[in-house]
């Protein structure tokens, strides 16, 4: 499996590309600000054909170029209905103050939009993506999971073994969690989503967040200060996350 990407725009939002390998169909996750040209270069480098865009949530730093990119290639954009209104009106999800940064730019909904449904996987480009609704950072936040071939310390595939990879947007970061002070955010709900949707995953699950470096569930379970004592029924004292819109 090929999983690659780059940080896009002033918010350094991680845009990911997922495919079964070079020369195959591909899925783009979270094309943010100024992502179109880097995406095209990455797709050309690996001889990939984009077939869909997946959005972890509707905040502008993750969706900025979803419409122009998807419409140029004639491919659908998948998003949870809770965040779909942000595609045409980003200020709905970030508030008036942050919305002022949009200026005179006009946003429209992509020509093809498909609503994601909790616990209903989608198969795209020959890859099955688990779909878990994880509200709290936004009303429609989604965690996508895929099973990728496991590799050893030298990078060689381990026959018959896989590792879960979670694309979790702004739900959980290395050492932090998503902010909850924007419209539709809820700290209590975010912690509940993490407890219900991420912490049950194996410790070796690779987390590819919307901002910052990759991490693992085991590392965050052991060291993330926001998760200490967090289970399916317990929450730590309220704290604020630090990344992303």
What residue ranges belong to the model's regions?
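Short loop/turn motifs at secondary-structure junctions
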Residues: 2, 49-50, 203
